[in-house]
Amino acid sequence: DEGVDLGGGRIIQNEMVMNPDEQSFDSILKNNLEPEIYSMRVYKLLEEAINQYVVDENQQIKIHIKLDTGMHRLGFEMNELPDLLHKIKNNPNIKVESCFSHLAGAENEVFDDFTKKQIHLFNEMSSVICNKLEYPVLKHILNSAGILRFPEAQFDMVRLGIGLYGIASIGEEQKDLENVGTLRTIISQI
């Protein structure tokens, strides 16, 4: 819903829809939004929606592939990529715009070894995607803490999250920031 509201002629940048539910794919396709695909179930829902709602066989639906690099909640694991990429290559309507993952503990140096393993695995997985698809795919893994602590892993872009609101995920950085607003949301998945 937010993506459609933002669109409406006012936002001209690409809009990624995180965690799309199955009822939203018709709206996503009609409004040229770009869904995050984090499982084969969600990919199949996308293909079904394309078959139902896309009338122009040349229309490109941009997607963003979430990779599981260690959180084990959402995302494709390395062993799932060959099947996913085969399906994507055989669907002329689908184009991968980006692949991404999320760092579980970038704000805490206790987890630095794990974070570095996540970054290394992400680099391997994103290379598999780019090599198989044979076209450039944007890559991003850094959150607010990662931007500060792991600048070498900036890849093509970063996702400034809570830092955007003047809240540091690393304690010593907080003294240099000011709160700029209030953040409210709904729980979309447990």
What feature does the model see in each segment?
Residues E15, Q60-K62, L133-K139:
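Short beta-strand/loop segments at the ligand-binding rim of alpha/beta enzyme cores
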Residues Y43-V54, T69-I190:
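Active-site loop/helix belt of alpha/beta enzymes
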Residues D26-L29, E48-N58:
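Short, charge-rich binding segments
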Residues E15-F25, N31-L45:
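Catalytic beta/alpha-barrel core
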Residues D1-M16:
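Positively charged, low-complexity/disordered segments
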Residues L29-P35, K62, E152-R159:
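Glycine-enriched alpha-helix->loop->beta-strand junction motifs that scaffold or abut catalytic
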